[in-house]
Amino acid sequence: MTEIRCYGCGAIIQSADTKKPGYVPESALSKEKILCQRCYKLMHYHQKMESHLTKDDFLRVLQTVGEKDCLVVYIVDLFDFNGSLVPGLMRHIGYNDVLVLANKRDILPKSLKEHRLNTWVRRQFKEYGIKPLDVVVTSGKKNMNFDEIFDKIDEYRHGRDVYVVGITNVGKSTFINRMLKNYSDTTNLITTSEFPGTTLDLIKIPLDDHSSLYDTPGILNEHQYTSIVDEKDLAYIMPQGEVRPMSFQLNSDQSIFFSGFARIDYTKGNKGNFICYFSRNMQIHRTKTEKADELFNRHKQLQVYGPASSMKEMKAYEFTLPEEKRDIVISGLGFICIHAPKGKIKVYVPEGID
């Protein structure tokens, strides 16, 4: 019997076990192109797939890439840049050339110019000791700069294979789907290739007669909010369109709540400016710090707020702010641009979240 594979993740299609990769209801087996249930939910409902990838498997993947002479396409998330970095990437992929795709441009305000974003990404990579061949600012959702991406891949690969790397939720699937449309004859079946030392199947897209593009599996960043929220909350916290900055003037001993997911206390300082960049779904409230715990518990009972049952389950991080503006990033959730010279703040997030 010919194996049928999910055209989203490459898993072998089966309808026997809902908990195993590749599951689809029998009613879907007659379709010409089949997405497994997990890929279908991810594509249509923005629900995350359960990860079957271990850290050891992920490291083996990177080490295997490092042993090859190839072009690495590294996809990062502009909205959560630090949270989307693959730890120790350059240590594992050796001296291979790297093309960076800075995704999710559509989420950031239009007032941020593309060339400034490009320069900022290059500067951030330089601080991490990474010098990519090139950086392209893109939006998978809006098909932004994809012709430029395809041209640069063809320019930089020099006939070599291409490996796409990135953690989950950076938009890798959208990019791969566009690559499929650009390079593949839709009448041909997509092939997969098993990675040495793992049980992982990779989607393989032929680029020409001698080379291919491989989609490496992503891994969850355990320090991102997206790794701990329920599936129903994932679409709630992940922006689906351009974020609208919300500005608050805070005096000392005032607090801001970000639904039930995070809280900032302004503990000391003159009046400060707090500009918040979060999903439009996020309910953001300002209150006096002395009323903050009461407000949290009251709204928790109304199911307005999120995952932590009380503020005591969250960990507090204290910061003294500099004279200039400072961004406070809550990985996988959003960020706050604060201008409160020499002020002091306390940030509450669940333990383990950066």
Task: Kindly give the residue locations of the regions a language model identified.
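Helix-rich effector regions associated with P-loop NTPase G domains
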Residues: 1-4, 8-72, 96-99, 105, ...
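Short acidic, S/G/P-rich loop/turn micro-motifs used as interaction or catalytic elements
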Residues: 78-82, 106-109
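Histidine-anchored nucleotide/phosphate-binding helix
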Residues: 84-97
